């Protein structure tokens, strides 16, 4: 598995494919990308061993499935009273709290749609099979699956004819016009023309006005996983402040998590560097906020859905108060706000103070207002409208205004279902409300980091990640971040040093701790050899001076 599987159930499903026979054992290895990825994978693997799976999230009375099943009933019998439909569906778990008003809303759409899917007498509370049944049968058999059919457009560099990515139809419908600049894979491109299911683009140097492309449905990292990753970082902070060496901490964690000590040590590098700088580490009970140039970075370890909800809420409220647009990005462990000088860390912390005092209803209303403006909502709207039969499966969105389409569904059961789906699959409102309550009751603290304008090591990991998706970080600054990141990683490497003058001194030293001119502490010689092997292996090699070496030892010496 390349990169973290993001969820326990995904890991079990994928690794399980390796042992599909009686008596065989499923084995798997996760190859990670950075420290976030590694710590996340460690937590997920531990949870898999302990059988701590994510709960199954059953949709709450989905209206699109209800409409489809009502058609199925009308195919079997021509006339159904509302109470008959109600009595049948209330016995199914997803519809346990279904009301006759819900049924009436769905039937209103089916009755007013052209051509009709059902003829309805609201006075008699009766649904009747329409005389013209072609549309009804087409709708039923074209929507047997609730899995959304989504058209994707291949983005092609016209100069090389090479594919550089894909865009989903919702983004293409709104912005897929010649001359529009957008960001994909961290670089700005300009649309030259759209031909069929291909979008031809050319590279541009100026990203001004470029629109970040929307990402499809990513697998969300659960709240519990993100919290445990944060608790590991908090534990490392505590132990280092008590004088425990990073190597010892890594060895201890390797006993708890299914990873070797070297892998754990690499995953802790940024956290160790963070603590060594004297900066507070973000933990499961601590939000830290830092400022870097025109960005405010909020370290909030609440997982994908809660962080997305928090990011959208913060971005919306800040935009309304400052009367200017605010760019916001998030990952499961942090939120990036591009304030362009309109707000600083103190203003963001003050915003949290205001949010925690707001009633839950106000939070929900503001988050809803923010959400319906996003590409995420428009994408869900297309999926739901298709499942209701309001949009043909392969409609050409180049001839349709997506904004007008969304507006036309306002107040309908389609709009309501799309909003419900966003709040179920993309945002975690209840978790957000709980987080704000925990901040209010001081169960979670929010602290400002004084960094002197330098980005912290843990934030650096997130910046590298978010730069792959958007132009949030300009390329010239990103180069400096990458150089700084590479420098920090190299300096945190541990190597074994050996005196090649007398072969009586070996020691493992972190490169960051080396003096400008390293010498042997025993004889003062500058003739030091450097190995990536463990100290015990090198010591055994040094003890054999003048003796015949094994093949492996000869290789070490040559290296």
Stretches found by the model and what they are:
Residues 195-212:
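Short, solvent-exposed secondary-structure boundary/capping segments
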Residues 4-56:
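Conserved segment of the helicase C-terminal RecA-like domain
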Residues 76-81:
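Short capping segments at the starts of secondary-structure elements
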Residues 86-152, 212, 220-559:
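Extended, highly charged accessory segments
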Residues 167-183:
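Short coil-to-beta transition motif at edge beta-strands of beta-rich domains
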Residues 147-166:
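Short, basic/aromatic beta-hairpin or loop at an interaction surface
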Residues 52-67:
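Short alpha-helical segments that sit at the start of domains
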Residues 187-194:
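Short beta-strand-centered aromatic/proline hotspots
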């Amino acid at each position: 598995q390349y990169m973290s599987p993001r969820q326990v159930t995904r890991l079990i499903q994928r690794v399980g494919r390796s042992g599909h026979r009686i008596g065989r054992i499923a084995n798997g290895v996760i190859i990670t990308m950075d420290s976030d990825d590694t710590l996340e994978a460690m937590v997920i693997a531990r949870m898999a061993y302990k059988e701590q799976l994510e709960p199954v999230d059953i949709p709450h009375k989905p209206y699109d499935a209800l409409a489809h099943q009502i058609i199925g009933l009308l195919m079997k019998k021509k006339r159904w009273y509302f109470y008959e439909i109600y009595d049948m569906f209330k016995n199914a778990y997803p519809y346990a709290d279904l009301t006759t008003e819900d049924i009436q809303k769905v039937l209103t759409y089916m009755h007013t749609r052209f051509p009709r899917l059902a003829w309805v007498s609201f006075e008699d509370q009766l649904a009747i099979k329409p005389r013209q049944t072609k549309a009804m049968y087409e709708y039923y058999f074209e929507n047997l699956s609730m899995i959304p059919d989504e058209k994707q457009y291949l983005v092609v560099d016209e100069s090389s004819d090479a594919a550089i990515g894909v865009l989903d139809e919702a983004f293409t419908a709104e912005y897929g016009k010649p001359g529009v600049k957008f960001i994909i894979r961290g670089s700005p491109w300009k649309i030259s023309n759209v031909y069929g299911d291909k979008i031809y683009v050319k590279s541009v140097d100026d990203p001004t006005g470029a629109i970040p492309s929307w990402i499809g449905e990513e697998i969300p990292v659960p709240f519990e996983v993100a919290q445990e990753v944060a608790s590991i970082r908090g534990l490392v902070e505590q132990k280092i402040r008590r004088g425990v060496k990073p190597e010892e901490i890594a060895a201890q964690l390797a006993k708890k998590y299914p990873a070797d000590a070297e892998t754990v040590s690499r995953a802790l590098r940024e956290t160790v560097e963070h603590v060594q700088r004297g900066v507070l580490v973000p933990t499961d009970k601590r939000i830290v906020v830092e400022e870097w140039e025109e960005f405010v970075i909020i370290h909030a370890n609440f997982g994908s859905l809660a962080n997305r909800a928090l990011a959208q809420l913060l971005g919306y409220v800040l935009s309304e108060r400052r009367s200017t647009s605010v760019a916001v990005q998030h990952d499961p462990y942090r939120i990036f706000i591009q304030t362009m000088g309109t707000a600083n860390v103190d203003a963001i912390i003050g915003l949290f103070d205001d949010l925690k005092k707001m009633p839950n209803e106000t939070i929900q209303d503001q988050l809803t207002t923010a959400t319906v403006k996003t590409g995420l909502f428009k994408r869900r709207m297309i999926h739901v409208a298709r499942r209701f039969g309001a949009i043909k499966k392969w409609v050409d969105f180049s001839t349709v205004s997506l904004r007008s389409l969304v507006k036309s569904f306002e107040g309908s059961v389609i709009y309501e279902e799309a909003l419900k789906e966003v709040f179920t699959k993309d945002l975690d409102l209840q978790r957000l409300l709980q987080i704000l309550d925990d901040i209010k009751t001081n169960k979670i603290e929010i602290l400002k980091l004084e960094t002197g304008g330098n980005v912290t090591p843990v934030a650096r990991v997130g910046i590298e990640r978010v730069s792959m998706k958007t132009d949030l970080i300009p390329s010239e600054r990103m180069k400096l971040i990458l150089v700084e990141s590479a420098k920090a990683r190299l300096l945190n490497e541990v190597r074994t040093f050996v005196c090649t003058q007398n072969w009586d001194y070996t020691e493992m030293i972190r490169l960051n701790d080396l003096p400008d001119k390293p010498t042997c502490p025993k004889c003062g010689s500058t003739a030091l050899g450097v190995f990536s092997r463990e100290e015990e292996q090198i010591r055994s090699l040094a003890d054999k001076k003048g003796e015949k070496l094994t093949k492996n030892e000869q290789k070490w010496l040559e290296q």
